[in-house]
Amino acid sequence: MNISRTTFAGFADATEQHFIDRTASFLKANVPALAGVSDVELLSNVQHVVGKARSYGFVEESDVVRFALCSALLGLEFDHDFPGAREILEMKESATYRADLLEYYTREIFEALEG
């Protein structure tokens, strides 16, 4: 049995859309600031952010979701608006290590704001 390229691409697109849907649901459930955002807008933003994460070399779902969470907390353009985040993203380290650093960086920002 051979699967055509078109069929395979369709499966890949469906899998990516399912991931975007799950990521949007996770963000809406865990980021109170997103409560008032419509599902259509959120899905559009998540699709954009997932594309950005991939452009920085994030492949693993957990790394992409952490990138998306940082974006939800710091803003859609956090990678340009926060020099520290930009520095982390431009590092030559592994994607998982950079996702760890982004998560830590974001926590540090919020802890500084709370304290």
Each predicted region: which residue ranges?
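A contiguous, surface-oriented mixed alpha/beta subdomain in the mid-to-C-terminal portion of proteins
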Residues: 1-115
